[in-house]
Swiss-Prot record:
The gene is CCD1. One of its GO terms (molecular function) is carotenoid dioxygenase activity. Pfam families: RPE65. GO terms for cellular component: chloroplast stroma. This is Carotenoid 9,10(9',10')-cleavage dioxygenase 1. GO terms for biological process: carotene catabolic process. Residues 1-32 are annotated as: Disordered. It is an enzyme of class 1 (oxidoreductase).
Length: 562
């Protein structure tokens, strides 16, 4: 905070040199690592399995229902190869030529004991669109974890759903023992790659925040092939967020990883040529869960929120991450090309947690963050046993402002509960924009609509439910018994010279009455209740997490570069 303004300007405006960017450039093609784990079967493996079964039988409460293995959360065990000539009601716009993908948890094998929604193996559901025709495909991300469990024909890695009480400590020891005895090969990590996807430098990445990215290739017929693990020529030695940011103006990618050992946060910049630059450790007092962050043209914004990694709490029957309602929410704003953390500015706001940010930008002396703010968080709500209610889970759209000159921080409520999974026209990432599209929720985990917000309009404060009016321009209601997932905005044209909301929203929908899954395409400008197109799918698509649209140009560029 004591640095001069001229120093701060130099740090935030100066990009890395050409020499730094090119340091590993000639090796960039080798940054995809073929995943070839070497687990071992034998007497030791069988003995540990037997011990585990006995302990689970006596120590695990199997009477508790595993909610996220039932209904449309239940996995589909089989992959679906490209299924072409799908029925399309309406017409698919030309700008949707490409592949719409959504990843989510889909456990291939039944859990040994507990199960949390975050635990399942990553399965990608894709809709290849070309010239008005659609093809559906689903494929597992071929992670090291999945390969090894296929080898054993059963679950072997511990799960978040197990990590409660003394039983949780036992399950941790079981995995450590299996790794020590080389029964499990953890040299390629433990990733499920089940959370989100992003495209950068000719590569489509499947992400989960506990490990490194997996590279997915989109084939011409829409099929999805796992190429391997991305370690940026061994420069990535820590976890990698599920929500990195790509600046559409510079083609750079910005990311971070969090850890339960110091440094708890590590910030990274990846050049437009796919070179990962030196790590920037971020100092915070305790290890936390930090699911998302944000960038502006000149800054990166870090969220030190009080969801702490506290293993001792598991003895009390809590999960390994515990929310502390007595602590302030802290936001760190760092010049995004900083070589270290010396120029970071920290701002305090009232206690909260944030899973997902919409966008951020600079407005005079202020840095503005648009986010979905949660007053409290209990990860047990997405554990095995869950009440399908919204009580104690009040996610709302907020505007937060951090004044880089005065050090003041303010926040403003922009919506009634409950909204999340905010998406924008990503041509505006890191720049001032107007429209945000969020999912609305019928209960803790089921999406019942898509809401369009106008950040230029004043919100109607005091409302308990979401209604059109004020800053709510439109709500697309899925109707009774139908539930969706994150909607991705696809612009009619690239760039920022056309109207920001001129485009379409595309998302998966499941009808719990008929058991049918579909893909909806709606007009993002008008939010008309009549979809532009509906595509009938050949099989059930379980509820999942984040989605992405790979356009035709990216598919062709990807095929040329990988």
């Amino acid at each position: 905070m004591g640095e001069s303004a001229s120093t701060e300007t130099l740090e935030k405006k100066q990009p890395f040199t050409a020499e730094e960017e090119a340091a590993d450039g000639k090796k960039s093609h080798r940054s995809v690592v073929a995943v070839q784990p070497k687990p071992r079967k034998g007497i030791l493996s069988s003995t540990i399995d037997l011990i585990e079964k006995v302990i689970v039988y006596f120590a695990h409460d199997s009477s508790k229902p595993l909610h996220y293995l039932t209904g449309n959360f239940a996995p589909v065990r089989d992959e679906t190869p490209p299924f072409a000539a799908l029925t399309v009601h309406g017409s698919l716009p030309v700008c949707l030529n490409g592949e719409f993908v959504r990843v989510g948890p889909n456990p291939k094998f039944s859990p040994v004991a507990g199960y949390h929604w975050f635990d399942g193996d990553g399965m990608i559901h894709g809709l290849r669109i070309k010239d008005g025709k659609a093809t559906y495909v689903s494929r597992y991300v071929k992670t090291s974890k999945l390969m090894q469990e296929e080898y054993f024909e059963g679950a072997k890695f511990m799960k978040i759903g197990d990590l409660k009480g003394l039983f949780g400590l036992f399950m941790v020891q079981m995995e450590l023992l299996r790794a020590k005895l080389k029964i499990l090969d953890v040299s390629y990590g433990r990733s499920t790659a089940n959370t989100a996807m992003i495209y950068h430098h000719g590569k489509l990445l499947a992400l989960s925040e506990g490990d490194k990215p997996y590279v997915i290739k989109v084939l011409e017929d829409g099929d999805l092939q796992t190429l391997g693990l991305l370690d940026y020529n061994k420069r990535l030695a820590h976890s990698f967020t599920a929500h990195p940011k790509v600046d559409p103006f510079t083609d750079e990618m910005f990311t971070f990883g969090y850890s339960h050992t110091s440094p708890y946060i590590t910030y990274r910049v990846i050049t437009k040529d796919g070179v990962m630059l030196n790590p920037v450790p971020i100092t915070i007092p305790e290890p936390i869960m930090m699911h998302d962050f944000a960038i502006t043209e000149n800054y990166a914004i870090f969220l030190d929120l009080p969801l702490y990694f506290r293993p001792k709490e598991t003895i009390k029957g809590k999960l390994i991450f515990t929310f502390d309602p007595t602590k302030k929410a802290k936001f760190g704003v760092l010049p995004r090309y900083a070589k270290d953390e010396q120029l970071i500015r920290w701002f305090d706001l009232p206690n909260c947690f944030i899973f997902h940010n919409a966008n951020a930008w600079e407005d005079g002396d202020e840095v503005v963050l648009i986010t979905c703010r949660l007053k409290n968080i209990d990860l047990d709500l997405v554990n095995g046993a869950v009440k399908e209610k919204l009580e104690n889970f009040s996610n709302q759209l907020y505007e937060m402002r951090f004044n880089m000159k005065t050090g003041a921080a303010t926040q403003k409520e922009l919506s009634a509960p409950m909204v999340d999974f905010p998406r924008i026209n990503e041509n505006y990432t890191g720049r001032k924009q107007r429209y945000v599209y969020c999912t609305s929720f019928a209960n803790i985990d089921k999406v019942n609509g898509i809401v369009k917000f106008d950040l230029h309009a004043e919100p109607e404060t005091g409302k308990k439910v979401l209604e059109v009016g004020g800053n709510v321009l439109g709500i697309f209601d899925l109707g009774p018994g139908r539930f969706g997932s994150e909607a991705v905005f696809v612009p009619r044209e690239a760039g920022t010279r056309v109207e920001e909301d001129d485009g379409y929203l595309i998302f998966f929908v499941y009808d719990e009455t008929t058991g049918e899954s579909k893909v909806y395409v709606i007009d993002a400008k008008t939010m008309s209740p009549e979809p532009v197109a509906v595509v009938d799918l050949p099989c059930r698509v379980p509820y999942g997490f984040h989605a992405f649209f790979v356009n035709e140009e990216q598919i062709q560029k990807q095929q040329a570069e990988i």
